[in-house]
Amino acid sequence: MRIWVLENKTAAEAAEKIMLLKTRLKSFNFNFGDIAPILLTDNGGEFSNATAFENDESGNLETHLFYCEPNSPYEKPDIEKNHTLFRDIVPKGSSFDDFSQEKVDLIFSHVNAVKRKQFNGKSAYDVFTFYYSEILANVLGISFIPPENVIQSPRLLKTIK
């Protein structure tokens, strides 16, 4: 899972971030639609420009964006598991005001490093890099965290400057 920090939480800002990602992926010969043929999101205003997410810069459809119903975690259980793991590190009620992209990347690198029953004892990072590559994980800002170094508690935040 990859999360981007949005300063203003607007559709324009989200569209800009997704276009920057698509451009960056292309510069490494990766196609966004091959990596993410389906996008699941909530109904937040920052996701209201579906065309920016679904189409490439030429207007060609490359992925499909689906909006999940409010209060329906069963529609995106894997995302909800990541949310639970995130909350192990950043408890509900915590402020995100000082969260830089680097801080979020480190938090989700730890989330992605947790071994999971659903992956037969592998981590999301292990599964992702098996199918795609460590290069792509690095392009996305996802770092490998050795199992013995995973910190799945608020203590991780104290290690981040």
Predicted regions mapped to residue ranges:
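Short small-residue beta-strand/loop micro-motif enriched in glycine and branched aliphatics
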Residues: 1-4, 67, 92
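Active-site beta-loop-alpha junctions of metal-dependent nucleic acid enzymes
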Residues: 3-30
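Active/binding-pocket-proximal capping segment
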Residues: 9, 20-21, 55-62
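Extracytoplasmic/secreted cell-surface and envelope-processing proteins
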Residues: 13, 47-50
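Short helix-terminating capping/connector loops at secondary-structure junctions
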Residues: 30-35, 60
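Hydrophobic "anchor" residues on beta-strands that sit immediately upstream
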Residues: 38
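RNase H-like two-metal-ion nuclease catalytic core shared by retroviral integrases
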Residues: 41-43, 50, 54-56, 65-89, ...
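C-terminal domain-tail junction helix/linker
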Residues: 92-161
